[in-house]
Amino acid sequence: YAFDKLKTKDDVNHFFKEVFPDFYEMMPEIGDTWEDYPLAGLVIIRCFPWSFGKVSLIGDSAHATVPFYGQGMNSGFEDCRIMNELMIEHNEDWEKIFKAFETLRKPDGDGLQDLSLYNYYVMRDYVADPEFLLQKKFELRISKLYPEKYLPLYSQVSFSNIRYSVAYAKGMEQDAFIKEIMANHDIRSMFESEKVDDLIHEIFSDREAYDLVSN
């Protein structure tokens, strides 16, 4: 099955009846809804500069992204907060405010877009992968034992004030580090034998807490 194979309402109804029968029972009008709301493309906007004279882009107009991290509205709210802070800092000198704003937020707009695309590939290719799920379990255990030394990428993005650009860079660094550990140790058997904590203490007890710069 693929979206491009669903040409008619009957195709849609047949697909959901066969593949998702429980869903079809709850929403038997899915064929009509499919026709009323056709598929549309998703876009990312990357541009710079964001300001000209007394006008500045903000939110989606500056850094629209795909929805795979659920952070689009939040990033817009962050823009508003930072713009307000800059208004106070620069005493409403709009030329200075806009220049400072776009310089500060452009890397984070790009960072959110990189995160969103990365999470799309994760959801598409890895959420049912046993090794990926084991890695997430391992990361959560590390974070529980050493929260000041290891914060999973999703937590950095969704439950902190860490800049998107910093979270993305740190997340990729952490991913490579954890993959290296897992390549050299049988993490699955360590969980089963309850020895995984010993390995975590061995690796992380002497590591310095990392500095994650917030907005």
Q: Whereabouts are the PLM-identified features?
A:
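FAD-binding beta-loop-beta segment adjacent to the flavin cofactor pocket
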Residues: 40-57, 110, 132
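Glycine-rich phosphate/pyrophosphate-binding beta-alpha loops
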Residues: 41-46, 62-74, 107, 120
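Active-site flanking residues adjacent to catalytic metal/cofactor-binding acidic residues
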Residues: 58-60, 78
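Conserved FAD/dinucleotide-binding core of flavoprotein oxidoreductases
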Residues: 1-43, 90-92
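Hydrophobic/aromatic residues within well-ordered alpha-helical segments
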Residues: 12, 16, 79, 105-108
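C-terminal helical "tail/cap" subdomain of flavin- and related membrane-associated enzymes
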Residues: 85-215
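A short alpha/beta connector and helix-capping loop motif
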Residues: 69-86
